[in-house]
Amino acid sequence: METAEPVSYEFPGHAVGAVAPRRMMGSNVGHNFPFYTNPTGGYTLPFHQSSSPAYSFGHTLNHHHHHHHHHPGYQHYFVAGQQPINPQPVRLSSEPPSIQQIPDIRPAKNAVNRVARDPLMKIEHNGASQQPPGAQSSSNEEGAQGKSSSSNEVEFSTEVDILMKAIQAKASAQSPGVQSLPPLQQLTHGGSNGYPQSYSMPVTTPRCTVMVEEAPSRSGKKRKYACTLPQCGKSFAQKTHLDIHMRAHTGDKPFVCKEPSCGQRFSQLGNLKTHQRRHTGEKPFSCDICQKRFAQRGNVRAHKITHQHAKPFTCLLDDCGKQFTQLGNLKSHQNKFHATTLRNLTMKFSQVTEGDHMSPQDRKLWEYFATLYKNSNKGIKGRGKDRRISPTSRSDPGSESRRRIEPLSSTDDKMRRASYGDTSMYNGGSSSDDDDAEPYFIERQAH
């Protein structure tokens, strides 16, 4: 076995000599214990934080001699001839219990609020700032991989979405009785309450338990089939609806479009049938006033608003007062013409704490956005770029005045129809095909 050569570590305040590990000549030496040839346990000892500063091996390393077996500087890292112990680390009763990650379960978007992960994200960023440079680089690489893997998904990050995240975060913090659940991936078996010490457990509500007492479904049936996954507890009147809901957790999409060069997958058969109408051009639903036909029943309901000359969505920012027939058009208008006002409101609302006085105008805007975009975490889509499923046909010159806008099928259908028991994003109806309220045609001004 080769001898070790001293190298110097330059620590602030003092320089200590350390022994650099060298490559071992014998092939029978375990990789986990490079300094020992005697038999040791086949496990890695857990790291226990000592009272001395990190990387401090003691002054004895300055006298680099060749007797490594009983070197006091490595007693916290390698123990020779130790008897086999319990793989679980021994801890004092005063120490907090160890945190163990539960299996990675994909959360159902209809049962979990994404805004609730912001506090945990801040804690993770603070902890990452104290990591060594090597750990930071590795975490950055993992973040880049995660970002690239989710680059195909539609992200809603407009000014309205950012404002709604701030409002929903404050609303959940100030109203613990109706607080949304934290994401399933970040739940840990920490203390007695199942949460890590840095995250306080929300107040238990009837919706947070597995066996819940919820109101009957719209059909009047009792919701007796409940989701058994941790911290979900949604219940349904039919077992089929529960099976569909479970696919939102697992990500299973058993229904595949058989159209050549398509192959998109869906979690519900109804979503597949709706998607197939885009290939076939079938439009089974018609307006009883003008006989205009649509592929989805919900689009007929949105279209009828144009016959009623009703514009129920009004912009209250900057005393605008402009009215719109569809919520998506109002959102696009606010993002385009009131971006500065939205940013100012986001800054103001994010700094609001419980007990602070809020002016009547700010309170009105708070309630206005909280009610108008209450389902924005599911994706209220406005008129934006790159939102079409296929290029617009240019054979008809008159088609520029009226353009057909269709959503991306796989991602938007997943957000729009998380489960049968969920509500629609626009009108509170069912998320099935008959009650889809997706805007189908959008008027465009000729330039």
UniProtKB/Swiss-Prot annotation:
Residues 140-155, 421-431 have a biased composition (Polar residues). GO terms for cellular component: nucleus. The keyword Nucleus applies. A zinc finger (C2H2-type) spans 225-249, 255-279, 285-307, 313-338. Residues 127-139 have a biased composition (Low complexity). Residues 397-416 have a biased composition (Basic and acidic residues). Pfam families: zf-C2H2. Its main location: nucleus. Transcription factor that acts as a positive regulator of ochratoxin A (OTA) biosynthesis via controlling the expression of antioxidant genes and oxidative phosphorylation genes. This is Transcription factor azf1. The lineage of its organism: Eukaryota, Fungi, Dikarya, Ascomycota, Pezizomycotina. The gene is azf1.
